[in-house]
């Protein structure tokens, strides 16, 4: 049964199969005809202003009909020359020989669909010569007649217009390439420049500052920029009590206005982990210090913290192995170190 079906299918002639026509759009001749039919001519004045608009039924609606720019001036000159040349061809026939058309045979045959330009100067004198390879051998190359002069002037105008079109095409390609590169490097989902600036500014302001600043300067300008207020000078003035021969201690009397109005002294919790030089391993000692800070008022708490930090600084300076140059320079360096350390402690 299967063999009979296969035999019948083999014996079916090819003509009985459905014939699907080959799409005509794939053939070369039809494509060229389609291209010829769909060729669109654009208004030259609108093209000068980068606005491609079809020329058909556009003359009365052209927004650049009265434009006096340099590019549109070339279009107007070319139009005038074409009108003049047509008038010469109609009314100024020099003799009978010029009225007869002389065709110069060309070895190259005209291909189907190929545009073959002819020499305009020879055409004005009744001859038809192919333009390819004819420029130097043209017998009317330097003809002084009025028609050849019009043709030469029109050729110059056309060359200028071609330069303008090439420049416009080049600018369009450069703009397209620039936009594509910009869209690839900077996608739309990336944050804007203002958002990036605010993010960087916020990260700089919230970045942690070092606990000890450089001892090269004793001025209060070395304070951290994130400090919300500027401390007054009497807060850091030393007193005669609890002074060592080489160091100075901060004052024991703090103005009540600073202690009462500054929320930084009372609201922020104090932890001994903020002092890296304070190596207290006994939990009871740490608890006593914290209880002392919690029970005392703001002035006594600040005095206790500064005294503890001063003692740690003295111990660290005595253990350092770098000798000082002389007594006066050593005193000045220690004063600068103490003042900078006090400023950093208050900032923390």
Swiss-Prot record:
Q: GO molecular function of the protein, one example?
A: RNA polymerase II cis-regulatory region sequence-specific DNA binding
**Region Disordered: which residues?**
316-348
Q: May I have one GO cellular component term?
A: nucleus
| DNA-binding region, residue range(s) | 43-91, 119-166
Tissue distribution is: Dimorphically expressed in the dimorphically connected interneuron AVG; expression is observed in the AVG in males, but not in hermaphrodites.
For this entry, list what GO says about its biological process.
male anatomical structure morphogenesis; mechanosensory behavior; negative regulation of synapse pruning; regulation of transcription by RNA polymerase II; response to osmotic stress; sex differentiation
Localization in the cell: Nucleus
According to its UniProt record, where is this protein mainly located? nucleus
Q: Which SMART domains match?
A: DM (SM00301)
Keywords on this record?
DNA-binding, Metal-binding, Nucleus, Repeat, Transcription, Transcription regulation, Zinc
Reported consequences of knocking out the gene: Decreased response to nose touch, but normal motor and sensory behaviors and normal levels of glutamate receptor glr-1. Small but significant decrease in response to high osmolarity. Decreased reversal responses to direct stimulation of the polymodal sensory neuron ASH as compared to wild type. Defects in male mating behavior; reduced efficiency in locating vulva of partner. Alterations in AVG interneuron synaptic wiring in a dmd-5 mutant background.
Identify the InterPro entries for this entry: DM_DNA-bd (IPR001275), DM_DNA-bd_sf (IPR036407), DMRT (IPR026607)
- Main role? Transcription factor. Plays a role in neuronal signaling in polymodal sensory neuron ASH, downstream of sensory receptor activation. Required for maintenance of AVG synapses.
Q: Which family does it belong to?
A: Belongs to the DMRT family.
PANTHER family in UniProt: DOUBLESEX AND MAB-3 RELATED TRANSCRIPTION FACTOR DMRT, DOUBLESEX-MAB RELATED 99B
**Descriptive protein name:** Doublesex- and mab-3-related transcription factor dmd-10
Species for this entry: Caenorhabditis elegans
């Amino acid at each position: 049964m299967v063999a009979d079906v296969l035999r019948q299918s083999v014996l079916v002639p090819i003509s009985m199969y459905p014939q699907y026509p080959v799409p005509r759009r794939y053939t070369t001749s039809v494509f060229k005809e389609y291209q010829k039919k769909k060729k669109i001519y654009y208004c030259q004045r609108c093209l000068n202003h980068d606005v491609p608009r079809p020329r058909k039924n556009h003359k009365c609606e052209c927004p650049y009909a009265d434009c006096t720019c340099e590019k549109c001036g070339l279009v107007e000159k070319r139009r005038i020359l074409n009108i003049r040349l047509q008038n010469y061809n109609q009314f100024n026939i020099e003799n009978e020989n010029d009225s007869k058309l002389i065709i110069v045979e060309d070895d190259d045959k005209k291909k189907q669909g190929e545009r073959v330009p002819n020499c305009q100067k020879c055409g004005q004198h009744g001859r038809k010569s192919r333009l390819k390879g004819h420029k130097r051998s043209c017998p009317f190359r330097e003809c002084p007649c009025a028609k050849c002069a019009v043709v030469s002037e029109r050729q110059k105008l056309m060359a200028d217009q071609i330069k303008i079109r090439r420049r416009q095409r080049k600018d369009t390609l450069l703009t397209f390439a620039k936009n594509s590169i910009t869209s690839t490097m900077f996608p739309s989902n990336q944050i804007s420049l203002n958002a990036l600036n605010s993010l960087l500014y916020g990260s700089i302001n919230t970045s942690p500052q070092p606990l000890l600043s450089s001892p090269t300067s004793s001025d209060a300008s070395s304070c951290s920029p994130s400090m919300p207020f500027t401390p007054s000078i009497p807060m850091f003035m030393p007193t005669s009590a609890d002074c060592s021969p080489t160091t100075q201690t901060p004052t024991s009397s703090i103005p009540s206005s600073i202690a009462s109005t500054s929320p930084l002294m009372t609201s922020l919790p104090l932890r001994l982990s903020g002092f890296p030089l304070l190596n207290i391993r006994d939990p009871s000692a740490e608890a006593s210090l914290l209880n002392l800070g919690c029970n005392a008022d703001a002035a006594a708490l600040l005095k206790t913290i500064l005294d503890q930090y001063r003692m740690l600084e003295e111990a660290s300076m005595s253990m350092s192995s770098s000798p000082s140059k002389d007594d006066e320079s050593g005193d000045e360096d220690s004063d600068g170190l103490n003042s900078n350390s006090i400023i950093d402690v208050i900032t923390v």
